Amino acid sequence: MFKRYLSSTSSRRFTSILEEKAFQVTTYSRPEDLCITRGKNAKLYDDVNGKEYIDFTAGIAVTALGHANPKVAEILHHQANKLVHSSNLYFTKECLDLSEKIVEKTKQFGGQHDASRVFLCNSGTEANEAALKFAKKHGIMKNPSKQGIVAFENSFHGRTMGALSVTWNSKYRTPFGDLVPHVSFLNLNDEMTKLQSYIETKKDEIAGLIVEPIQGEGGVFPVEVEKLTGLKKICQDNDVIVIHDEIQCGLGRSGKLWAHAYLPSEAHPDIFTSAKALGNGFPIAATIVNEKVNNALRVGDHGTTYGGNPLACSVSNYVLDTIADEAFLKQVSKKSDILQKRLREIQAKYPNQIKTIRGKGLMLGAEFVEPPTEVIKKARELGLLIITAGKSTVRFVPALTIEDELIEEGMDAFEKAIEAVYA
């Protein structure tokens, strides 16, 4: 239990966590012996209990440039004293600059070659909602029956009703009854001929296809280049809009600015979405479309109150400038090599516990034979924060700026946790 505590930076008093959580809806499961009070790059601090942690979660792939990034804090302070919000009734320079920058940097760094327009919103699920609406609008303009969406098993696209409808895990969907209709789930492991047959047979009913280039919540599964390339060809031939969800795997996380930059240009999506790292913890998201999609949209087709506000855009402009840099991305790949090397060494020591290591860049997963709940708990006791993905995979998504020595220290703690659990 937390003892009553007066923070040095806030007048807020912590009573017991049980008393505190009585005021929050019951939608999260959190450890009751941990309350984060501050952070610094890839470390988090619990000043209530006098503990510190190496953070391999980065707020679930959000704080790509680290906790308490001083430049982000400076930008927020400056912009908050200038203009926070003026609505989407009017242009603001920060929003215009960011939209142009996303399009230009995307093309420069091998992403969507025909990127054209940007819709700014506040969260990943919102960005995916916009993508689904845009794809459906494009389809319905061609044929009123062309409004279905194809998604994939093990996918996760969000928890609002549209994004939830294309999220695979039934535990998220079934409690809420009927969701958005005309959604089909296919298996990415199926042969291309089977996928092609399904899409061709239902081409007059399918408006869009949504896929994560690297499935995150489903277990850190990178989709093969050949599979994504084949899917784009099939969809293009059948006038189906391809959406890539890069909420988690985008913005340098894969070692490239966008995960779809590993693909040939002809396989690039018609729409892709970004959030999480886009604001380094400040809420902002984006839906990026090509001109084919934009041509289907009209004034009033979509909107958002806070999306593209100057405060969020000012931070995002800095984030994009920092990550869209060859030297920065090379450092991500270098850090990935360090982390992968240690993971494979640990796997070699515990082959009966760890089945495989997979992922790209600093989005890696270690799949265990059994659910790694106790390993994660023990790691936390040893000062390391890690999370799961899927049923039995430990996910590693640290800040892209994590120090090399912290990677080593974190992996030492991970190995000790495995040893303690399986000794």
UniProtKB/Swiss-Prot annotation:
Reactions catalysed, as given in the entry: N(2)-acetyl-L-ornithine + 2-oxoglutarate = N-acetyl-L-glutamate 5-semialdehyde + L-glutamate
Transit peptide: 1-13
InterPro entries hit by this protein: AcOrn/SuccOrn_fam (IPR004636), Aminotrans_3 (IPR005814), Aminotrans_3_PPA_site (IPR049704), Class-III_PLP-dep_AT (IPR050103), PyrdxlP-dep_Trfase (IPR015424), PyrdxlP-dep_Trfase_major (IPR015421), PyrdxlP-dep_Trfase_small (IPR015422)
Keyword set, alphabetical order: Amino-acid biosynthesis, Aminotransferase, Arginine biosynthesis, Mitochondrion, Pyridoxal phosphate, Transferase, Transit peptide
Pathway field: Amino-acid biosynthesis; L-arginine biosynthesis; N(2)-acetyl-L-ornithine from L-glutamate: step 4/4
SUPFAM superfamilies: PLP-dependent transferases
Names of the cofactor(s): pyridoxal 5'-phosphate
Functional note: catalyzes the conversion of N-acetylglutamate-gamma-semialdehyde (NAGSA) to N-acetylornithine in arginine biosynthesis.
Additional facts recorded: The reaction catalyzed by ACOAT is highly reversible. Moreover this enzyme may transaminate ornithine, although this activity should be of little importance at physiological pH.
PANTHER family per UniProt: ACETYLORNITHINE AMINOTRANSFERASE, MITOCHONDRIAL, AMINOTRANSFERASE CLASS III
Family: Belongs to the class-III pyridoxal-phosphate-dependent aminotransferase family.
Protein name: Acetylornithine aminotransferase, mitochondrial
Organism: Saccharomyces cerevisiae (strain ATCC 204508 / S288c)
The gene coding this protein: ARG8
